[in-house]
Amino acid sequence: MALVTFLFIATLGAMTSHVNGYAGGGWVNAHATFYGGGDASGTMGGACGYGNLYSQGYGTNTAALSTALFNNGLSCGACFEIRCQNDGKWCLPGSIVVTATNFCPPNNALPNNAGGWCNPPQQHFDLSQPVFQRIAQYRAGIVPVAYRRVPCVRRGGIRFTINGHSYFNLVLITNVGGAGDVHSAMVKGSRTGWQAMSRNWGQNWQSNSYLNGQSLSFKVTTSDGQTIVSNNVANAGWSFGQTFTGAQLR
C-alpha cells in the first residue's frame, strides 16, 4: 500500500442510522503472544492493508488475529480490550485496547498448544511487543488472556484513501470508530447514484466505475449495522493517492 500523499479534511455532510453507538461484548478466554520487535516495526503493513500504522493513527496498540477471530478480513479495524489472567508469575495488572490490523496465520505443522497458537479453532492475539509488555512480562512468551469487543474511539473522521486507476478505484477505509470493522461500503459520484463496492482485501474496497472528475460520497456500514454517510468528502478535482476525511461513528 502506497503511503498517503495528501490529507484533505472536509466533512461536508454526515448521517448515522443509529444514535446509541456500539455496545461491545462480554469477556471471552483466549491466549496472546507478541511479534514485530521492541519498536513494533515488524507489525507495519499487514493483511488489513493499513500500511504504516503510525501514520494511520493506530500506533503500537495493534494485534494480528487468529483465523477464528480474523473472519477473512472482516474483523480488520475492530477493537478489543485484553487483560492477562490466571498467571501470577507473568501477568501484569490492567488492560489494553488494541485494533485488529493483521492476520496471524495457522501453522498446521505444530500442535495448537506448542507453537500452533493461531491454528483453528484457537482464539489468539499476536500483539505488538510494546503493547504485550503492558499486560505481561516479556519472558512469558505466551499468556492466557480474557478479551472483549469494545467501541473504537478515534480522533477525527473516517479516512478514505483513493488508490488504483480509472475504472479500478481501490479505497482504503481507515480510522473507523464505533464497531470499527467495515462490513459494507458504497460510493456515489456527483453524476451517479449509490453503488455497492466489493471488498478486495483487508479494508480495501473496490469500485470499477469511472468516477474521475466527480465529487465523491461514501456510505459505510460496520458489523453492528450502524451506517454513516460522508457526503462530498472528495471534491471533483481529487486524484489517486489522496486521502479524504469524512464523518465518524461512535
Swiss-Prot record:
SMART domains: DPBB_1 (SM00837). Residues 45-157 form the Expansin-like EG45 domain. Causes loosening and extension of plant cell walls by disrupting non-covalent bonding between cellulose microfibrils and matrix glucans. No enzymatic activity has been found. Belongs to the expansin family. Expansin A subfamily. This is Expansin-A1. Disulfide bonds join 48-76, 79-152, 84-91. It comes from Arabidopsis thaliana. Residues 1-17 form the signal peptide. GO terms for biological process: anatomical structure morphogenesis; plant-type cell wall loosening. Expressed in stomatal guard cells and very young vascular bundles throughout the plant. It is found in: Secreted, Cell wall; Membrane.
